[in-house]
């Protein structure tokens, strides 16, 4: 999946010898019904953004994604550069109130679009709208119940900085880790 994101804008999913789905990479990665094809553990979304600043003290970059801003490990790109960021569903947590006193720096206001529970596992995939774009979160079914999550509900998406992969930014070195 990482190679598809880095190299292409369009993707085709084949099933039983035929085209099952085709479209933009971002669009197909957001589809919860394609989890088996896109990989549950590596499932995620691609966000389009723009570098809006750098913090040399902490070696971070700020990326605007619509009206919201994400902090990520320093990207070797100039302010104003457009970027695509891969955010894995397993690196997104959800909260119904804005958390404080935590190490996760990226807390985005969001609205639940879709919840798909995996009946034979402990997990659920939740698709949330963060404004102009969407994120996937892979959380437990128990968390969905405990939080009272429902389509249309307001949540906060907590994105770990480790979720940003330098390879998607065009650098073939190892993935960015914090």
PLM features: residue spans?
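Internal alpha/beta loop-helix hairpins
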Residues: 1-68
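Generic beta-strand structural signal
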Residues: 14, 54-56, 87, 117, ...
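Exposed loop/turn and edge beta-strand positions of beta-sandwich/beta-sheet ligand-binding modules
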Residues: 45, 106, 122
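Short aromatic-glycine-enriched beta-strand elements
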Residues: 57-62, 118-127
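Glycine/charge-rich catalytic "coupling/switch" loops of P-loop NTPases
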Residues: 69-116, 134, 138-178
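Short beta-strand-turn/beta-hairpin segments enriched in glycine/proline and small hydrophobics
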Residues: 125-135
